[in-house]
Amino acid sequence: MFTGIVEETGTIQAIKKTGLSMALTIAASKVTSDVRLGDSIAVNGICLTVTGFSDNQFTVDVMPETVKATSLNGLSKGSKVNLERAMSANGRFGGHFVSGHVDGTAEITRIEKKSNAVYYDLKLSPELTKTLVLKGSITVDGVSSTIFGLSDESVTVSVIPHTISETIFRTKAVGSIVNIECDMIGKYLYRFLHKTEQTKSNQTITEAFFSENGF
């Protein structure tokens, strides 16, 4: 479990591709201070398992499905990435519940600075937006963000200058692809309500069927 509060940005040192999978070696300082084999670290919002490490770098394996569903294929040596260690039981909870299981990607279509905030318009699938709500939470490349605008195929988030300077938001431009994880609570609620509606519909059909057939 993560919070969406990025601890530091790391630098891609090496990318090893094997078939449809890959291994990433990432230079970092803070997240490697107490790292152990098997630890979970969110890389641009994606929960990945540490398979090797040294003093100032660590390696993670990326499965084919993760490569396909995220923006990791766009990384190259020298790319910056957002990093967050899994939340400890006694840690502070500063963002929102983030699983590290990315739902898909979005394209940045507009960036506008207003006063002390920067607004990002993100184009994404209606399959993702249907679980979102205004003023709700969404994770963008591992950053816990608040939704200020919402339509069937777009979301607007507002980011403060501190977050931009401390994360890879500072490298983003119109056309950039970002990883998206929708709010976990919203997804569960949508699933629950959708399944309840289906159950009611099925019950109505079944009762009508029996009635029409003399039962």
UniProtKB/Swiss-Prot annotation:
The protein's annotated pathway: Cofactor biosynthesis; riboflavin biosynthesis; riboflavin from 2-hydroxy-3-oxobutyl phosphate and 5-amino-6-(D-ribitylamino)uracil: step 2/2
Q: Which residues form a coiled coil?
A: none
Binding residues for 2,4-dihydroxypteridine 2, per the UniProt record? C47, L48, T49, D61, V62, M63, P64, E65, T66, G100, H101, V102, K135
Known EC number: 2.5.1.9
Q: Native species of this protein?
A: Bacillus amyloliquefaciens (Bacillus velezensis)
**Function summary:** Catalyzes the dismutation of two molecules of 6,7-dimethyl-8-ribityllumazine, resulting in the formation of riboflavin and 5-amino-6-(D-ribitylamino)uracil.
Listed A to Z, the keywords are: Repeat, Riboflavin biosynthesis, Transferase
Q: Which BP terms does GO give this entry?
A: riboflavin biosynthetic process
Q: What is this protein called?
A: Riboflavin synthase
Record-level Gene Ontology MF annotations: riboflavin synthase activity
Q: Which residues bind 2,4-dihydroxypteridine 1?
A: G4, I5, V6, S144, S145, T146, S158, V159, I160, P161, H162, T163
Q: How does it assemble?
A: Homotrimer.
Q: Tell me the gene name.
A: ribE
Q: Which domain of life is it from?
A: Bacteria
Q: Which InterPro entries would you find in this protein's record?
A: ATP_synth_asu-like_sf, Lumazine-bd, Lumazine-bd_dom, Riboflavin_synthase-like_b-brl
